[in-house]
Amino acid sequence: MSGSMATAEASGSDGKGQEVETSVTYYRLEEVAKRNSLKELWLVIHGRVYDVTRFLNEHPGGEEVLLEQAGVDASESFEDVGHSSDAREMLKQYYIGDIHPSDLKPESGSKDPSKNDTCKSCWAYWILPIIGAVLLGFLYRYYTSESKSS
């Protein structure tokens, strides 16, 4: 390992039974922290490092949003915004490596939405109050119209 960057070779399958050699570049958090300007901007999302410098002017939320998260772990902010599947797919083109395993903090719970079941009941937070309000409205109309007819 030289400096704050390391490369590891790994082999895997391409899904067609062929062995494929893949190379992962590891970055230390100190290295990522240096990349926090308009000239070079790196983000860490779920242990993966992304060079989003080319995306600064295109980001729908503006470059300020990216600059606030530059050089640090932006996983929580990324998930809080609720990025679309298209945005997650687009992120792949900016991938440059992973955070070095010794710099990863152990996660108590996964923030990956594909593994997170809490949002499956998110609709209940909105639909139940709406149904309740509609029912109250009907009851109010029923009782006020009944009192007028008697």
Curated annotation (Swiss-Prot):
PANTHER family: CYTOCHROME B5 (PTHR19359), CYTOCHROME B5 TYPE B (PTHR19359:SF95). The gene is CYB5B. This is Cytochrome b5 type B. Its main location: mitochondrion. PROSITE patterns: CYTOCHROME_B5_1, CYTOCHROME_B5_2. Heme binds at H59, H83. GO terms for cellular component: endoplasmic reticulum membrane; intracellular membrane-bounded organelle; membrane; mitochondrial outer membrane; nitric-oxide synthase complex. It is found in: Mitochondrion outer membrane. Cytochrome b5 is a membrane-bound hemoprotein functioning as an electron carrier for several membrane-bound oxygenases. The keyword Transferase does not apply. The modification N6-methyllysine is found at K39. The chain crosses the membrane at residues 123-140. Component of a complex composed of cytochrome b5, NADH-cytochrome b5 reductase (CYB5R3) and MTARC2. Residues 1-15 form a propeptide. The modification Phosphoserine is found at S23, S37, S84. One of its GO terms (molecular function) is metal ion binding. It comes from Homo sapiens (Human).
